[in-house]
Amino acid sequence: MIEREVVVQSEDIKLKGILCLPDGDGPFPVLLYVSGSGPINRNENIPGLSLNNSRIIAHHLAQQNIASLRYDKRGVGDSGGDFYSASHSDLVDDAVACTQFLQQQASVEPAKIFVAGHSEGSIIAAQVATRQQNIAGIILLSPLCDKMESILMKQAQDLKSMVMGRKGFKALPLKFVTLLFDPIKVQKKLIKKIKES
């Protein structure tokens, strides 16, 4: 397996990510992984919570001779732009740019590009499939089954409760950041931006 740092141009924003390729020459079928809501990096991590979900999936796919691309959302990790000023449409445009990038890779089979979206990423994956005719299929992981506003507010409340419930000295920096950037207020701001976009 080879992991290659890549840069995807989405209008004036440079998105950085990892193209994970199986051993061998290819071309390979490929999966674009679109993360869920919030400022999540290419491995589906946020400060204080390292899940590495998309990294684990990418490594398992490589063992099955399937390539994958995972990327930092705009304004997150090594990608340019500002996450908090990005609209939902911007995030869809970014994912579309990633599929166009994949079409140009010699190691990728252009007729076998799949898009997997987790949570909010499932909405984005579906929108990418309607805009890009070459998408072979979509995979919806934990798709939204309620109003997005309700889901976002529940996530913020759960995150705040989880962080504030932590004990010990190591939890203090995370608690401080949570108090400084209250997840509930951040989600309300995000919801407002989504409604305006």
PLM-predicted stretches and their roles:
Residues 108-119:
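Alpha/beta-hydrolase fold nucleophile elbow
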